[in-house]
Amino acid sequence: MDAAAVISLFILGSVLVTCSILLSSFSSRLGIPILVIFLAIGMLAGIDGIGGIPFDNYPFAYMVSNLALAVILLDGGMRTQASSFRVALWPALSLATVGVLITSALTGMMAAWLFKLDMIEGLLIGAIVGSTDAAAVFSLLGGKGLNERVGSTLEIESGSNDPMAVFLTITLIEMIQQHQTGLSWMFAVHIIQQFGLGIAIGLGGGYLLLQMINRIVLPAGLYPLLALSGGIMIFAVTTTLDGSGILAVYLCGFLLGNRPIRNRHGILQNFDGLAWLAQIAMFLVLGLLVTPSDLLPIAIPALLLSMWMIFIARPLSVFAGLLPFRGFNLRERVFISWVGLRGAVPIILAVFPMMAGLDNARLFFNVAFFVVLVSLLLQGTSLSWAAKKAKVVVPPISWPISRVGLDIHPENPWEQFVYQLGADKWCIGAALRDLHMPPETRIAALFRNNALLHPTGSTRLREGDILCVIGREHDLPALGKMFSQSPPVALDQRFFGDFILDAEARFADVAQIYGLDGGEEFREHQQSLGEVVQQLLGAAPVVGDQVEFAGMVWTVAEKENDHVLKVGVRVAEDEAE
């Protein structure tokens, strides 16, 4: 490749990335998932589009996509809270194993019938599209305000279900090449190997990487690069040993994000930009790889297969996978069924048959691409609507416009939060001494009209003021309510109820005040309101959990770890309003 070709490649790549970034602003206006825009730009630049670029380098696409996935999952793992694992680990693992098997089998049988393939080839299509995609889930669920149980289950499922899909795909390709029709006992061994090595190397390598970051003194800008290179190495080593590199890098990120780590906020800030770049590059390359004119002949059967997977296979697999977990109500199960988002992973898995030289490899790739496109357009665009209908959205809190870590020491948890006060904030006009600040938080600075003030307790807040608050991550919910829109309890009242009670209050006293019937066993044992709600829920509580009892609707309004702190209450008849 001569110098002119290299420069042309740089120009082409920068133009495509720039167009992707600029056009991403239309995503929210049009209600289209941003990943679809990246994919569409790649298709427009491809052989059938206005760019006319011929691209069929599958090994290169495989390399770029795997590198991008490693970056996205490392970033996603760092942002996953340990509390999410406590709430959703086992349900998510059930969906990642049993759920993927059921989805793949049902989708595969339908694919064999629709495309008139051998059953094993149909099952290969089912395996290729059988897992949800972490890049799509992390991108589309961000900022939706889902309750912790639902959001965490979907995120952990998407980060851990790829090993099963990858293993099924590779196994079925080998069976087709060797003309086998049955599975051997090695099937189970390989599954255990994928998960076992992924977990062991991910956590072990993540721990070693954490120690390295905390013990070596480097310029601040090098810590994100050290974390990135270490995560990619863990991904590559695990994959080389026939383990799940995707699971390993996700767990590595999870460990780094939930332990004290040097320059934590610098790492996260850099990872945010890198994850966006990875998503853009991955979907551009995958868009270039497809030939849109090849999708037209298979459009009808591929659309039918997509509908079968979305409306039949995915719901059946979710209901079966969540059967042992009674903490999920019907609305939550239905919503999780709907959010079976497909993205880059099925397209990457569809490259495997191309590289293996299977007879119908092009058909497998085109079907997988079509299914991903339908999933992103149908499920991705309706996500917000479905969440509201299923009532799995909790009232949002006001987040700071900026967060800066005070990285004095790896063990130091303190941060600076910056809030800008608009006219709709309830605290406008309030004196600083009247603000009920969370314990151990301090207002470090107050800016007004670009000037730094020296406030006193009598200083009153005005529209446009910028507050710098020193606190810790667990203070964000309380600070968010303090700087929320006016009136501060309006949304809480609509969602949680007319009154929010302390969970330590005795149920007997609450029942007497409200004149409630029933619950004699709780009164006799002098149980607190929080204990009663947790017992009725039968699962680890999350904010937004509701239970109807004694003619009232009780809603978890605040919790810490697995303990309920505040409970909202309203008359049950209000549900119908």
Swiss-Prot record:
Family: Belongs to the monovalent cation:proton antiporter 1 (CPA1) transporter (TC 2.A.36) family. NhaP2 subfamily.
The organism's taxonomic lineage, starting at the top: Bacteria, Pseudomonadati, Pseudomonadota, Gammaproteobacteria, Enterobacterales
Catalytic activity entry: K(+)(in) + H(+)(out) = K(+)(out) + H(+)(in)
Alphabetical list of Pfam families matching this protein: CorC_HlyC, Na_H_Exchanger, TrkA_C
Subcellular location: Cell inner membrane
Annotated RCK C-terminal domain residues: 403-485
Function, as annotated: K(+)/H(+) antiporter that extrudes potassium in exchange for external protons and maintains the internal concentration of potassium under toxic levels.
Membrane spanning residue stretches: 3-23, 30-50, 58-78, 95-115, 122-142, 185-205, 216-236, 237-257, 280-300, 303-323, 334-354, 363-383
Molecular-function GO term, any one: potassium:proton antiporter activity
HAMAP family found in the cross-reference section: NhaP2 (MF_01075)
Chief localisation class: membrane
An individual GO BP term: cell volume homeostasis
Record's bilayer topology term: Multi-pass membrane protein
Entry's Gene Ontology cellular component terms: plasma membrane
Keyword terms, alphabetized: Antiport, Cell inner membrane, Cell membrane, Ion transport, Membrane, Potassium, Potassium transport, Transmembrane, Transmembrane helix, Transport
InterPro entries in the record: Cation/H_exchanger_TM, FAD-bd_PCMH-like_sf, FAD-bd_PCMH_sub2, Na+/solute_symporter_sf, NhaP2, RCK_C, RCK_C_sf, Transptr-assoc_dom
Protein source organism: Klebsiella pneumoniae (strain 342)
The protein, known as: K(+)/H(+) antiporter NhaP2
PANTHER family to which the protein is assigned, alphabetical: K(+)_H(+) ANTIPORTER NHAP2 (PTHR32507:SF7), NA(+)/H(+) ANTIPORTER 1 (PTHR32507)
Ion transport as UniProt keyword: yes
